[in-house]
């Protein structure tokens, strides 16, 4: 079953998530359905295509209105400051990658759950109230299906 992914915050970490999904050929497992960032689709497409660290993105990237199109996959670009107002239910988002650095507690990150997402992964150290702090390869076996807001420790 394909996991529908949304990214909130399209800085270094958000862009690396996109890069990882495409460069490891995992698009049959993970479908990126939305990016929420204050930058517009054209700017974010450019940042996807050209990276000073990783070089040029090896896939076709274009813009179609408020969508970034990567290899034919349409990714909706949003610019909403309040995560509770995002259309995660409409987009059937399974997991939000919270990459802004602003919503690092369970209380704040749960706004994505309120908006309709099933789970949230915080890309920064989480507050004491997160369900778990998971470092894959170190303690990933502690992750439970009932966890809704987790931190991946740090970017």
Located regions from the model:
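N-terminal Rossmann-like NAD(P) cofactor-binding subdomain of oxidoreductases
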Residues: 1-155
């Amino acid at each position: 079953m394909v996991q529908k992914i949304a990214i909130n915050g399209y800085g270094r970490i958000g862009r690396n998530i996109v890069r990882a999904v495409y460069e490891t050929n995992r698009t049959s497992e993970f479908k990126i359905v939305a990016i929420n960032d204050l930058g517009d689709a054209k700017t974010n497409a450019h940042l996807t295509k050209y990276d000073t660290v990783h070089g040029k993105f090896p896939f076709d990237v274009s813009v179609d209105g408020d969508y970034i199109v990567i290899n034919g996959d349409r990714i909706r670009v949003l610019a909403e400051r309040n995560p509770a107002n995002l259309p995660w239910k409409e987009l059937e988002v399974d997991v939000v990658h919270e990459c802004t650095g602003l919503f690092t507690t369970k209380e704040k990150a749960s706004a994505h759950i309120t908006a309709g997402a099933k789970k949230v992964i915080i890309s920064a150290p989480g507050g004491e109230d997160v369900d778990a702090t998971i470092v894959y390869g170190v303690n990933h076996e502690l992750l439970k299906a009932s966890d809704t807001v987790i931190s991946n420790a740090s970017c």
